[in-house]
Amino acid sequence: MRSFAIILLAVFFYSVFHSLLASLWVKARARAWFGPETERWYRLAYNAIAVVSLVPVLALPALLPDRNLYAIPFPWALINLVIQGLAGLALVVGLWQTGLWTFLGIRQFLAPPQSASPKLVVSGLYRWVRHPLYTAGLALIWFVPVMTTNLLALFLGLSIYLLVGALFEERRLLIEFGEAYAEYQKHTPMLIPTRIPR
């Protein structure tokens, strides 16, 4: 149980740190300290820090004492692997729809930020759920065919982080897009595609 608690705490501290970096307050502080050029490099730096700081969290399940919970036997494990493959594909498609290079911060770094208003994406995967990247991420981790106590702790922590993150993102999108996003919420599920899109 000690390993379980350590991993959950590690995910919690990572989530707080990651959310703090993404907050408008920290972005405003960075802009005040470094000037308008911050807009060009902040997203790229944010992603780099997020990836580097996630590495030790992901390493903990392999480094700490662990216990197997279950392993789905062949050929049934192939079903899980197919679902994971589809989830991985959905991640790529979803990122491409919303602007992969912008998401990574590369576009902002190479060219000055555009003054045009951001566009609300409601087509493609976003016709089925409002947060397809989170849906795909959850499917990717929970359909792993082998489960251990350490992986369970990691996946629980990451799932809570994704769900809380989705709620905060909903608030931000409502502020950013107003009535257009409120209307989108009425007709599109948040994470689970429970209806056929119109």
Residue ranges and their predicted role:
Residues 46-48, 77-89, 123-137:
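Membrane-interface loop-to-helix entry segments
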Residues 3-7, 43, 47, 77-84, ...:
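Residue-level signature of transmembrane alpha-helical entry/exit and packing/kink sites
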Residues 20-37, 62-72, 172:
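Membrane-helix interface linkers and caps
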Residues 30-49, 72-76, 110-123:
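Juxtamembrane helix-capping/reentrant segments at transmembrane boundaries
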Residues 10-24, 56, 60, 84-107, ...:
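Transmembrane alpha-helical segments that form the membrane-embedded catalytic/substrate-channel core
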Residues 3-17, 115-198:
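Hydrophobic transmembrane alpha-helices
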Residues 48-84, 146:
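Long, highly hydrophobic alpha-helical transmembrane signal-anchor segments
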Residues 4-14, 40-56:
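Alpha-helical transmembrane segments of integral membrane proteins, especially early/N-terminal helices
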